[in-house]
Amino acid sequence: MERNVLITADSTCDLPAELKKKYNISTYPLHIILGRTSYDDGVNITPDEIYKHFKASGTLPKTSAVNVQEYIDGFLPLVEQGYEIVHINLGSALSASYKNCCIAAEQLGNVYPVDSCNLSSASGLLALEAAEMAEKGMSGKEIAENIRALTSKTYGSFVVDRLDYLRAGGRCSTIAMLGANLLSLKPSIIVNNKDGSMT
């Protein structure tokens, strides 16, 4: 039986709604914890609300991965309808989401998790490429293999405008933050596309 392929991704791929709709990519939200309340990324909280929380409280949000049952609950109806699923995960060095997705995939079959070794737009680009492969009629297994090969060619980097977030998260000292601000330095964070760690 020939199976149609759907592309899904973790919410951290940061694809705009128009692209998700155009390529029929659904996302699975990671959890953002502010104080004692847990929110679903991109569902019931926006980046602006997270920034407002930080400004008001001075504390960074915590995050948690999509859990195994959430993946199963999302994938099972699709697998039962005859779809293969290629899921683009947030880099495994950054989150347990990939590990959890692999456990769900083992239980369900016809689900192909891909460790993007990246985040944000870099993993979003992989999801878009996977969607184009699906449109060409490639199988889920073929798409997953091709996307895994592309992870080493996909680079993510970010220029940090404000160091107060890095200081609050323990990534730089107060002195380093003040010195960078005084000299108007804007550090760049580069994602290692071999394991998803950041430097």
Q: Where does each model-flagged region fall?
A:
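N-terminal glycine-rich anion-binding loop in soluble enzyme alpha/beta folds
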Residues: 6-67
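Catalytic cores of large soluble enzymes that bind and process phosphate-bearing ligands
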Residues: 42, 63-67, 89, 139, ...
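Glycine/charged-rich beta-loop-alpha catalytic/anionic-binding loops adjacent to active sites
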Residues: 53-56, 82-87, 105-116
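Residue-level preference for short coil/turn positions at secondary-structure junctions
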Residues: 1-3, 81
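Mixed-charge interfacial surface used for oligomerization/domain docking
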Residues: 3-6, 12-20, 26, 31, ...
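Glycine-rich phosphate- or other oxyanion-binding loops that anchor nucleotides, phosphorylated ligands
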Residues: 57-59, 65-91, 100, 144, ...
